[in-house]
Amino acid sequence: MADPSFDIVSKVDAQEIDNAVNQTVKEIRTRFDFRDTGASATLSGESILLVANTDERVKAVLDVLQEKFVKRGISLKALTFDEPKPSGKEFRLPVTVQQGIAEDKAKAIAKKIRTDGPKGVQAQIQGDQLRVTGKKRDDLQRVIQILKTEDFEVPLQFVNYR
């Protein structure tokens, strides 16, 4: 019989992202403080473009977007963005939705498992996810608890627990 294992992934449901952006657009259209500001939010692939006529309005649109993400159960750790940049008469803020675990974060997670995890538990980096194997399921559950207490700046999900 094979050793028990599970995968650590960082994925965000594309449909939930679409729903959150659509709800943001709907709220922008109905709110009085966004009238005549040219505020909009558009989704294209893994990125969301927020546009408004002032720096403050773009940040307000970002707040609305973050509120909708939280309501839909999407971790805000999956969003990356910079400061709004002027573009002609408007300000633009590109927001990127991270999918997968970056290599440097994966190495940090694997190191945490090696140093703080139970003996005999191994973590292997497989592209944008990690596979954790061990002799006992109790050890794997302990690893999950250890990782939940740490902040790796990416939302982690534990899947394929066998």
Swiss-Prot record:
Gene Ontology terms, MF aspect: nucleotide binding
Similarity section: Belongs to the YajQ family.
Superkingdom, taxonomy of origin: Bacteria
GO cellular component: cytosol
Keywords noted in UniProt: Nucleotide-binding
Functional summary from the UniProt entry: Nucleotide-binding protein.
Organism: Frankia casuarinae (strain DSM 45818 / CECT 9043 / HFP020203 / CcI3)
SUPFAM superfamilies: YajQ-like (SSF89963)
Designated name of the protein: Nucleotide-binding protein Francci3_0558
